[in-house]
Curated annotation (Swiss-Prot):
<feature type="binding site">
    <location>
        <position position="91"/>
    </location>
    <ligand>
        <name>[4Fe-4S] cluster 2</name>
    </ligand>
</feature>
<dbReference type="GO" id="GO:0051539">
    <property type="term" value="F:4 iron, 4 sulfur cluster binding"/>
</dbReference>
<feature type="binding site">
    <location>
        <position position="61"/>
    </location>
    <ligand>
        <name>[4Fe-4S] cluster 1</name>
    </ligand>
</feature>
<dbReference type="Pfam" id="PF04055">
    <property type="entry name" value="Radical_SAM"/>
</dbReference>
<feature type="binding site">
    <location>
        <position position="94"/>
    </location>
    <ligand>
        <name>[4Fe-4S] cluster 2</name>
    </ligand>
</feature>
<feature type="region of interest" description="Disordered">
    <location>
        <begin position="1"/>
        <end position="29"/>
    </location>
</feature>
<protein>
    <recommendedName>
        <fullName>Lipoyl synthase</fullName>
        <ecNumber>2.8.1.8</ecNumber>
    </recommendedName>
</protein>
<keyword id="KW-0963">Cytoplasm</keyword>
<comment type="similarity">
    <text>Belongs to the radical SAM superfamily. Lipoyl synthase family.</text>
</comment>
<feature type="binding site">
    <location>
        <position position="72"/>
    </location>
    <ligand>
        <name>[4Fe-4S] cluster 1</name>
    </ligand>
</feature>
<keyword id="KW-0949">S-adenosyl-L-methionine</keyword>
<keyword id="KW-0004">4Fe-4S</keyword>
<keyword id="KW-0411">Iron-sulfur</keyword>
<dbReference type="InterPro" id="IPR007197">
    <property type="entry name" value="rSAM"/>
</dbReference>
<dbReference type="InterPro" id="IPR003698">
    <property type="entry name" value="Lipoyl_synth"/>
</dbReference>
<dbReference type="InterPro" id="IPR013785">
    <property type="entry name" value="Aldolase_TIM"/>
</dbReference>
<feature type="binding site">
    <location>
        <position position="300"/>
    </location>
    <ligand>
        <name>[4Fe-4S] cluster 1</name>
    </ligand>
</feature>
């Protein structure tokens, strides 16, 4: 018999996803050859990680287990996840910790601004956990972070990827009033899969959130994304595109769902690259100004370069 003694900490380790612990393992098919990423070992990666840690910040790159972290951090592109590392929702696809979050860190907006300056980011993406425990869903904290970055890095463009602010009246208005350049809220999947994949959310509430953001500020770029491989049908994906266009959404991202752990939703299918290309063509035909559709596409992947293309596409529209 072998006895393993933990000499590092005497504190019990809390499960990352306690609500999923009793679930049976969900087995996914083997990853195909086109799902490949390189290990994060570069100097740029190490430098980015050091800046994130010295400012006491969290990133969705780490917390959600993004497969593109090696590529992005090598270029010193990081997406900050504010309001803590613990989410009040328990989506079946997400690797972010779940539970009761800690109190907000009042120094976080300034720390995000400082890290943005140190990384030299021309385009910053800020996302967050859901904070259903807060009266405004964290909207004022998001707005404060936007303002802090504007003051510290006035030339940096800002993209926010927000929660849905369900039952948080006035929260959206607070965020939009802070004047981000891009307002992003991901639908994640088709409406028929919400009960199983995103049970705490409401599909048409999310559609309306995106529509309302553009109504409040017509100069705002709006953006949303979905994952494929969760059991959706092609016709349902096309309907999501139509729903987003009816809400005047400018930018659509489509990527392959990858299972974080065996306790998360299984991958039902791996979508081949040519089908992603087909969806991209159809989305452009439906009127999106910008579309990014590939197996490895994620909301903030190449966000800066894509924002420049988005600006150019709007500028080219007939007056």
């Amino acid at each position: 018999m072998v006895v393993v003694v933990d000499t590092v900490s005497d504190k019990p380790i809390r499960p990352r996803h306690p609500e999923k612990a009793a679930r049976p393992d969900a087995l996914s098919p083997k990853k195909p050859d086109w799902i490949r990423v390189r290990a994060p070992t570069s100097r740029g990666y190490a430098d980015t990680r050091a800046i994130v840690k010295e400012n006491g910040l969290h990133t969705v790159c780490e917390e959600a287990g993004c497969p593109n972290i090696g590529e992005c951090w090598d270029r010193k592109h990081a997406t900050f996840m504010i309001m803590g590392d613990t989410c009040t929702r328990a989506c079946a696809f997400c690797n972010v910790k779940t539970g009761m979050p800690a109190a907000l860190d009042g120094a976080e907006p300034a720390n995000v601004a400082e890290a943005t300056a140190k990384l030299g980011l021309a385009h910053l993406v800020i996302t967050s956990v859901d904070r259903d425990d807060l009266a405004d869903g964290g909207a004022a904290h998001i707005a404060a972070t936007i303002r802090a970055v504007r003051e510290r890095c006035p030339s940096t463009t800002i993209e926010v990827l927000t929660p849905d602010f369900l039952r948080k009246d006035g929260a959206l208005e607070i965020v939009v009033a802070a004047k981000p350049d891009v307002f992003n809220h991901n639908l994640e999947t088709v409406p028929a899969r919400y009960l199983e994949v995103r049970p705490g959310a409401r599909y048409f509430h999310s559609i309306r959130l995106l529509q309302r953001a553009k109504e409040i500020d017509p100069t705002l770029f709006t953006k949303s994304g979905i994952m494929l491989g969760l059991g959706e049908q092609r016709s349902e994906v096309l309907q999501v595109m139509d729903d987003l266009r009816s809400a005047d959404v400018d930018f659509l991202t489509i990527g392959q769902y990858l299972q974080p752990t065996l306790k998360h939703h299984a991958v039902m299918s791996y979508i081949p690259p040519e089908e992603f290309s087909s969806y991209e063509s159809l989305a452009y035909a439906k009127g999106f100004l910008m579309v990014s559709s590939s197996p490895m596409t994620r909301s903030s992947h190449h966000a800066g370069a894509d924002f420049a293309k988005l600006q150019a596409a709007r500028a080219a529209l007939p007056r």
